From Swiss-Prot:
HAMAP family: DltC (MF_00565). It comes from Bacillus mycoides (strain KBAB4). The modification O-(pantetheine 4'-phosphoryl)serine is found at S37. GO terms for biological process: cell wall organization; lipoteichoic acid biosynthetic process. One of its GO terms (cellular component) is cytoplasm. Its main location: cytoplasm. This is D-alanyl carrier protein. Belongs to the DltC family.
C-alpha cells in the first residue's frame, strides 16, 4: 500500500510540477491552482499507463479528487 501511495504521489508531483503534493496531502489541488483541467487529462493518462488504472474523464469529479489524499483513496477504490 505504501508503494502504491508513493507511485500516485510521484505521478501527481510530475504532472502538477509542484512538490507540495507530497508535503501537504490535504492541499486543495484545484482551489490552489495546482491542477487544472488540462493537467487532469494528463494525470488520468499517467494513471492508466503507469498504474494500469483507467479513470474515465466523465467519472472524474473535482470534489472527489480535490486533494492528494482523496486522489489516493479514489484510485484505491477503483483498482
Amino acid at each position: 500500500m505504501a508503494e502504491f501511495k508513493e507511485q500516485v504521489l510521484d505521478i501527481l508531483e510530475e504532472v502538477c510540477e509542484n512538490d507540495i503534493v507530497k508535503e501537504n496531502l490535504d492541499v486543495q489541488l484545484f482551489e490552489e491552482g495546482i491542477l487544472d483541467s488540462f493537467a487532469v487529462v494528463s494525470l488520468l493518462v499517467e494513471f492508466q499507463e503507469r498504474l494500469e488504472i483507467e479513470v474515465s474523464i466523465s467519472d472524474f469529479d473535482r470534489d472527489e479528487w480535490a486533494t492528494p489524499n482523496m486522489v489516493i483513496k479514489k484510485l484505491e477504490e477503483i483498482r
